[in-house]
Amino acid sequence: MEPLFPASTPSWNASSPGAASGGGDNRTLVGPAPSAGARAVLVPVLYLLVCAAGLGGNTLVIYVVLRFAKMKTVTNIYILNLAVADVLYMLGLPFLATQNAASFWPFGPVLCRLVMTLDGVNQFTSVFCLTVMSVDRYLAVVHPLSSARWRRPRVAKLASAAAWVLSLCMSLPLLVFADVQEGGTCNASWPEPVGLWGAVFIIYTAVLGFFAPLLVICLCYLLIVVKVRAAGVRVGCVRRRSERKVTRMVLVVVLVFAGCWLPFFTVNIVNLAVALPQEPASAGLYFFVVILSYANSCANPVLYGFLSDNFRQSFQKVLCLRKGSGAKDADATEPRPDRIRQQQEATPPAHRAAANGLMQTSKL
């Protein structure tokens, strides 16, 4: 099985085993023979269900951020870009479902290249947005006053734009090499040596598109926990409740993100060292880890929306579940730039250092 992006299908080398390590001819890598029965129907149905859930949840996030003026905070700008990336990421699933149902790619080489490139761009953008959000959370919690000059909507927009541009640059190999194979599937057609190019690509995407961002995320939240624990000792029970909320958010964000993507990259990396057997179980494993990686986009509206009181109230307003004016002011950890300046002017210098350690952090 060749390591690939989720938008492609699991592939086995049609030539000798030597081709997997760079030797042999450059014969087409084709998908596994379609399995009769439940899987041929179940996999496309699962793809479409994940697509519907992801599109619905992330579209709702986009709408409430754009609809309510008070939702346009720095953090929500990152959440908006994450939701846009997830929506575009979900749009590739109907094509993937069709290919798996029909056992070939019926949309032509141009759309194959476009879908795989967009899939790569939005995968990277989602990870980078999550990383930038974690850095922003670190600044908001650990340095709430001194970071005010950097935590502005303009800076957030520039950082988000940089994430999109960087993602496009990192996805250029897919734009260049994605094509319809002889077997009729949409895949990456690497030049000689095929095995070396494939191995370099999967290591490149795993390190820069998963493990390095995850390391940054873990470091940011570790520093947040250290800061909250240190502050919690001084401010008593209320602060300890905030500490528990931050810790819970850390666990949810890191574990769900890692849990959804780690199996996919693990399967691909293991396959570099030990070729997975050409049997239905391997194809089933691959389909499972691909669906799990897409399911992370369904979880994002829950992680970054429903755990926020402001998002929850906005969702209820939009869905007509309650009466009200929509979102309240920004989260307590998300003071608007003008409020930060007013705080700094009104707060005596002797108390500003204490404010850095005691600012409310219960709503992330």
Swiss-Prot record:
Recorded GO CC terms: neuron projection; plasma membrane
Annotated TM spans: 39-66, 77-101, 114-135, 158-178, 198-222, 248-273, 284-308
Modified residues (Phosphoserine): 325
Keywords recorded for this protein, A-Z: Cell membrane, Disulfide bond, G-protein coupled receptor, Glycoprotein, Lipoprotein, Membrane, Palmitate, Phosphoprotein, Receptor, Transducer, Transmembrane, Transmembrane helix
Subcellular location: Cell membrane
Biased composition range(s): Basic and acidic residues: 327-342
Cytoplasmic-side positions: 67-76, 136-157, 223-247, 309-364
Membrane topology value: Multi-pass membrane protein
Glycosylation sites: 13, 26, 187
Keyword Transcription regulation: no
Signal peptide boundaries: none
Tissue specificity field: Adult pituitary gland, heart, small intestine, adrenal gland, cerebellum and fetal hypothalamus. No expression in fetal or adult kidney, liver, pancreas, uterus, spleen, lung, thyroid or ovary.
Lipidation sites (S-palmitoyl cysteine): 320
InterPro entries: GPCR_Rhodpsn, GPCR_Rhodpsn_7TM, Somatstn_rcpt, Somatstn_rcpt_5
Molecular function via GO: neuropeptide binding; somatostatin receptor activity
Family: Belongs to the G-protein coupled receptor 1 family.
Protein name as catalogued: Somatostatin receptor type 5
